[in-house]
Amino acid sequence: MFSLRRLLLAATLFLGAMLLFAQSAEAAKGPKITHKVYFDIEQGDKPLGRIVMGLYGKTVPKTAENFRALATGEKGFGYEGSTFHRVIKQFMIQGGDFTKGDGTGGKSIYGDKFPDENFKLKHSKKGLLSMANAGKDTNGSQFFITTVITSWLDGKHVVFGEVLEGYDVVEKIENTKTGPRDAPAEPIKIAKSGELEVPPEGLEGQSEWASPAYANEDEKPAAPVPVTDAKPPAHDSIPAATADDDDTGAPLFAKVLFFGVLVLGLVLYIRLRRAPKGTYGKGME
């Protein structure tokens, strides 16, 4: 039979373990991948390989559909033949300007620009797809693929997918020699792009939620996307990190609660060890 001391200690450890398990389970449930698209990449006359990307069509349906349709070219325009015009090592690779090729052009399937859909997902790992912009609600066709965690972009750029296969090709692009304006010295082109078979139901991405509440949020039908015909700003770009930017990962409340449980367990253990023998009465030891 457990003594009271052992029972209290076991209960404390059990609560801590359950909290840790709950956090891990929540983190493991990522956004659903609804579509797969690909880019066949060339540099000069040399094939670099294929990048296969999964899109989060349940979480950001408008943004994912924009990228999917531009990858297939079904609207009469799209990514095929365009270049990666901006490459910054240990940050990201940027492309999608199929009208001017220098970061000042591009357009969405909804019109010139469309609003930020939501910021439910964080830039929590390398290999994530996110929209390049020139400020709030200025999404067009330009996108970037992260090559490191870029938490300072959370809440400013819309994450909508991830690299499923061919991250080695992303690394080849990232490590290419660049010149002025971070443009590759030798152009890197999307020679071919298109859509692949829809992945099995239940396939989940690896991007983390900005809030755990989003993981179980019921998906609602997408509202019509407002179209803006204003002239595009000078550049769709992505800001570099600043010293004040930080990403703590798990929600603060969960961290405090977990720490509190551990401290409580330690305090109980110390007090019970110091208690005089027989404190709990006969039959309890």
UniProtKB/Swiss-Prot annotation:
Record-listed E.C. numbers: 5.2.1.8
A Pfam family matched in the record: Pro_isomerase
Occurrences of domain PPIase cyclophilin-type (ranges): 38-195
Signal peptide per UniProt: 1-27
The keyword Isomerase belongs to this UniProt entry's keyword annotation: yes
GO molecular function terms attached to this record: cyclosporin A binding; peptidyl-prolyl cis-trans isomerase activity
Residues carrying covalently attached carbohydrate according to the record: 139
Catalytic activity: [protein]-peptidylproline (omega=180) = [protein]-peptidylproline (omega=0)
PANTHER family: PEPTIDYL-PROLYL CIS-TRANS ISOMERASE, PEPTIDYL-PROLYL CIS-TRANS ISOMERASE D-RELATED
Protein name: Peptidyl-prolyl cis-trans isomerase B
